[in-house]
Design a protein with these regions (language model features):
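A short alpha-helix-loop-beta-strand transition element characteristic
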Residues: 1, 90-95, 147-153
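A Rossmann-like FAD-binding core segment of flavoenzymes
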Residues: 1-84
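Generic structural signal for well-ordered, non-membrane alpha-helical segments
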Residues: 14, 63, 75-76, 100, ...
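General structural feature for long, well-ordered alpha-helical segments within catalytic domains
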Residues: 17, 30, 78, 113, ...
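Conserved mixed alpha/beta catalytic, RNA-binding, or beta-rich assembly cores of soluble enzyme
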Residues: 28, 63, 92-94, 128
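FAD-site-proximal beta/loop scaffold in flavoenzymes
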Residues: 68-122
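A conserved FAD-binding loop/helix module that cradles the flavin
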Residues: 117-158
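C-terminal auxiliary extensions adjacent to catalytic cores
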Residues: 161-190
């Protein structure tokens, strides 16, 4: 990877991912965009250029890179078709990627006994999806009588604490707040 280029003035993704990339020595060029890709029959290079606060290119700030690939990321959308079919309440949360099911801290949706985790509950980091799945599993085990309440709450708290670091950075914090809003809304309706 020659560089990460983003027109935004700061990294919009999760800090954990940016840190992994930075540790490998890949440079970040914030407030930049790709001006041009070069090559005859394939990509052989790219020129980036700095942009101002209105995202307009600033002449004279071009930088050249020898690359054979240009990757573009444009976002993700939650997959909620099955949840809609079950009658789950769906809310709009642009921070979480769009239309997501309202759900509790235990990952239970507005339809009793229907739980959600991962991208279906809102686009977040993959490790967050795993933790949400664990929380949903614990809640189901508790509901079915395989865990008593103190043990369930103890294990759920361990999982919730492990999610804190994953929701660091401006992007992660915003998603954490959006999830908290969904949880609070469900608790108020209960």
């Amino acid at each position: 990877v020659a560089a990460v280029i983003d027109a935004a003035p700061e990294i919009g993704g999760y800090a954990v991912h940016a840190a992994k990339i930075a540790r490998t020595g890949v440079p970040f060029f914030m407030s930049h965009t790709i001006k041009e890709a070069h090559g005859k029959d394939r990509v052989e290079g790219a020129t980036i250029i700095e942009v101002d606060e209105d995202w307009k290119p600033i002449p004279g700030t071009e930088k050249q890179f020898d690359v054979d690939t240009v990757c573009i990321a444009v976002g993700l959308n939650p997959m909620n078709q099955l949840l809609r079919m079950t009658g789950c309440k769906i809310v709009d949360s642009p921070v979480l990627g769009g239309k997501v099911p309202s759900h509790s801290l235990n990952q239970e949706t507005s339809v009793k006994g229907v739980y959600v985790a991962g991208d279906a509950s809102g686009i977040e980091e993959a490790s967050t999806a795993i933790i949400e799945g664990r929380i949903a599993g614990l809640a189901i085990a508790f509901r079915l009588g395989y865990l008593d309440e103190p043990e369930f709450l103890k294990q759920r708290e361990v999982q919730l604490k492990s999610m804190v670091g994953l929701r660091s950075g401006s992007h992660g914090e915003a998603r954490g707040k959006a999830k908290q809003y969904l949880n609070d809304t469900m608790e108020a309706q209960a």
